[in-house]
């Protein structure tokens, strides 16, 4: 299980012959586990706390939505902490999932993670996106 306000929140650790070990976690604000042997990561990166705070202060979102976002979705900062808590030495791709339309900045998120992991392909999920997940980058 993952941390979320849904009835049955789950993340998945998928093992496949061609793409290796894939972490899939969305609709969670925090992952308390470490995952050995990862080859690909699909991880929620829903909002920037700074953008969320600015939108709340400006009245673009109400208090209930603000609080629910924090308690049920993964921030950029928690996404970074999750990545840093795991051994990513064999990871080929990081796919950022479930970005908020109003409280995220895909370009900033990607660049921030690329600075930490320049050897890994970092992508934000979009409609129609097609990626190749392999155990090896070549």
Listing of model-derived features with the role each one plays in the protein:
Residues 35-127:
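Cap/insert and terminal regions of metallo-dependent hydrolase folds
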């Amino acid at each position: 299980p993952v941390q979320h306000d849904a009835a049955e929140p789950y993340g998945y650790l998928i093992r496949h012959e061609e793409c290796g070990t894939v972490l899939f976690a969305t609709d969670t604000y925090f992952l308390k586990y470490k995952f050995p042997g990862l080859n690909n990561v699909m991880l929620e990166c829903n909002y920037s706390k700074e953008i969320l705070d600015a939108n709340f202060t400006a009245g673009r979102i109400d208090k209930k939505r603000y609080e629910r976002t924090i308690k049920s979705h993964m921030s950029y900062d928690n996404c970074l902490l999750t990545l840093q808590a795991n051994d990513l030495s064999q990871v080929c791709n990081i796919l950022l999932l479930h970005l908020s339309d109003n409280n995220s900045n895909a370009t900033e998120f990607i660049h921030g993670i690329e600075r930490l992991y320049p050897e890994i392909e970092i992508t934000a999920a979009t409609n129609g996106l097609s990626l190749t997940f392999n155990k090896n980058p070549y």
